[in-house]
Amino acid sequence: MKYKIIKTNDQIQASVIEMARRINKDYRNKEIYLINLNDSAKYLIQDLKKVLKPKTKIIKFKYENYKVNSNSNELRILKDINYTLYNKEVIIADGIIISGNTHNYITKYLKLRMPKSISMICIGIKKNFLEKKIPKCYSLFSFNNEWIEGYGFGSQKTKNKRNLFDLRK
């Protein structure tokens, strides 16, 4: 099956450079603790690291989503952070933000460690679907109803491709 390319790697790279410009300005002379959620932003982080100026420590954080039939938005943490985040500049990295429920939960969880600040980066955000407030977010793109995969996240067919695809039929 052929999927529709909605963002080419060239378009993605241009947006990564723009994102880096904004982060470089906002975090000038600061160290960033960049937390990669479930490796869903691995390509974004790889490309961003090439143009980020602040010293950056990349940390993996793994979790399991809450159960579909449950009323709880709790996450099960599979790999926690082994660094102190006290008074640190924290940026959470993820693929696509849809409802914001997961990011709201993780932000509250990380705030218990008293970082100086928490913001986010993502490949895309679906602002029309946000249910929860999230921290300041640097996003490559905004999406509506597209089913986005590629550029490091999604199914095995598209995950390792450098473009973004819309999988809607």
Which residues make up each language-model segment?
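PRPP-associated nucleotide enzymes
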Residues: 1-169
